[in-house]
From Swiss-Prot:
The chain crosses the membrane at residues 6-26. One of its GO terms (biological process) is photosynthesis. It is found in: Plastid, Chloroplast thylakoid membrane. One of the components of the core complex of photosystem II (PSII), required for its stability and/or assembly. PSII is a light-driven water:plastoquinone oxidoreductase that uses light energy to abstract electrons from H(2)O, generating O(2) and a proton gradient subsequently used for ATP formation. It consists of a core antenna complex that captures photons, and an electron transfer chain that converts photonic excitation into a charge separation. This is Photosystem II reaction center protein I. It is a single-pass membrane protein. It comes from Phaeodactylum tricornutum (strain CCAP 1055/1). GO terms for cellular component: chloroplast thylakoid membrane; photosystem II reaction center. Its main location: plastid. Disulfide bonds: none annotated.
Amino acid sequence: MLTLKILVYTTIIFFVSLFIFGLLSSDPSRNPNRKDFE
């Protein structure tokens, strides 16, 4: 049960971090330096 719980928590943290990273990279107001590279 402990291994299953660790696997579930790891998957949740992985998807949450992907979601937050996607929001930060797609939001120009959060990341104004991105306009300089384009």
